[in-house]
Amino acid sequence: MVIQHNIAAINSYRNLSINQNALSKNLEKLSSGYKINRAGDDAAGLAISETMRSQINGLNQAVNNANDAIGLIQTAEGAMTETHSMLQRMKTLTTQAANGTYTSTARGNIKAELDALNKEITRIATTTEFNGETPLKPATKDTPLTFFIGASADTTNAMTVEQKNMTAEELKVNDLKVSNTTAAFNSMASVDAAIEKVSTYRAQLGAAQNRLEHTVNNLKVTSENITSAESRIRDTDMADEITAYTKNNILLQAAQSMLSQSNAMPQGVLSMLQ
């Protein structure tokens, strides 16, 4: 037996330190909810997790972007519902005026209603706004709006939505004439062309909205799957970690007990000297 070096105590202290460190990590993981709290815990796992988080953030913002685009489309399409309704009324009035049975006074009344309708069409186009944009009267004629609907810097993730000027002047129904049957026939043709133009634009917006709704669904599913994968890499499995904590706590207590007994061993030398 030697007393200069207590190998048993040194060994017990080393194991005590190991168990203390392990227990501290268990507590950190349980309290934070993450099994990777620093690069030293899992360098590769942390890098993969951060890449996934970047992608998740991009996907979630892309969902917001797509929903904004849907909101703009719904705003524009809703306004054009009224434009369509007024154009249909214009069609009725011009068809009515094409009949030769109306007096000048009656035609004047029809003209007055047509003028009121064209002013309202222009007002709606001018005042329809979404987040500062006026899709039915863009600042620059027929300038598309671009929406970014993906998580990566790829041009395929950029989607454009056309903006069309839907004022009465642009639709060429701002000065419909019904003073005689010939003028009324010409006005009917102008109204028909305007109805077709509005119908075409509404169809384009409807197709874009359908695409965006599918895009939102796909983005949400992708985000959900990547979030689940990232969670498996980074989040603490509470059941496993509690089991490890219990084991390390028992080992720590055992190491403390063994260290105490190891430190008492040299005392046996004193009994030999008595």
Which residues make up each language-model segment?
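Primary detection of the long, small/polar-rich alpha-helical "axial" segments characteristic
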Residues: 1-274
